[in-house]
């Protein structure tokens, strides 16, 4: 029986029994190898590795994540709502709703979601998924 394929960079490093710093992962979009800081950021963002049928594995570099997020927002934007409206639409509390950063694609934690509500900022539906603003992108934007 086949073992499940690793979904994170850390799982891949553990499966291969090599240090994370020695992992060489190409970006699926630009084919550049991710730098160590990008490997760590990939896992912190809650992204998953991309596996091909031939068992090649890819990730997404920070530059391509930003470009993808921008492209999707410009082409697949659906609507913007407040936090309370989002809870009404999804019939769930904000903490249970998956929301990614509209710039870097990081999965927002509860504090980032609540901060968006506190600041009366909007959440955006893009390609059937919710987007907000993470603390890092919010601090530089």
From Swiss-Prot:
Top-rank lineage group of the source organism: Viruses
Gene3D superfamilies from the UniProt entry: E6 early regulatory protein
Zinc-finger ranges (unnamed): 27-64, 101-137
Record-level Gene Ontology MF annotations: DNA binding; zinc ion binding
Compartment annotation: Host cytoplasm; Host nucleus
Stored Pfam families: E6
GO aspect biological process, one term: symbiont-mediated suppression of host innate immune response
InterPro entries: E6 (IPR001334), E6_sf (IPR038575)
Membrane-crossing segments per the record: none
Coiled coil: none
GO CC aspect terms: host cell cytoplasm; host cell nucleus
Key words of the record: Activator, DNA-binding, Early protein, Host cytoplasm, Host nucleus, Host-virus interaction, Inhibition of host innate immune response by virus, Metal-binding, Modulation of host cell apoptosis by virus, Transcription, Transcription regulation, Viral immunoevasion, Zinc, Zinc-finger
Complex and partners: Forms homodimers. Interacts with ubiquitin-protein ligase UBE3A/E6-AP; this interaction stimulates UBE3A ubiquitin activity. Interacts with host BAK1.
Cited function: Plays a major role in the induction and maintenance of cellular transformation. E6 associates with host UBE3A/E6-AP ubiquitin-protein ligase and modulates its activity. Protects host keratinocytes from apoptosis by mediating the degradation of host BAK1. May also inhibit host immune response.
HAMAP family the UniProt entry points to: HPV_E6
Family statement: Belongs to the papillomaviridae E6 protein family.
UniProt name for this protein: Protein E6
């Amino acid at each position: 029986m086949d073992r499940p394929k690793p979904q994170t960079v850390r799982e891949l490093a553990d499966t291969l029994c090599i240090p994370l710093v020695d992992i060489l992962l190409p970006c699926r979009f630009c084919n550049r190898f991710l730098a160590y800081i990008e490997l760590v950021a990939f896992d912190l963002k809650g992204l998953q590795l991309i596996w091909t049928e031939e068992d090649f594995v890819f990730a997404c570099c920070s530059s391509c994540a930003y470009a993808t997020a921008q492209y999707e927002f410009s082409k697949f934007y659906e609507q913007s709502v407040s936090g309370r409206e989002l809870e009404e639409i999804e019939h769930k509390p904000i903490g249970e709703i998956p929301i990614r950063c509209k710039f870097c694609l990081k999965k927002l934690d509860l504090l980032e979601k609540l901060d968006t509500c506190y600041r009366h900022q909007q959440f955006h539906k893009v390609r059937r998924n919710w987007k907000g603003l993470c603390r890092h992108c919010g601090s530089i934007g």
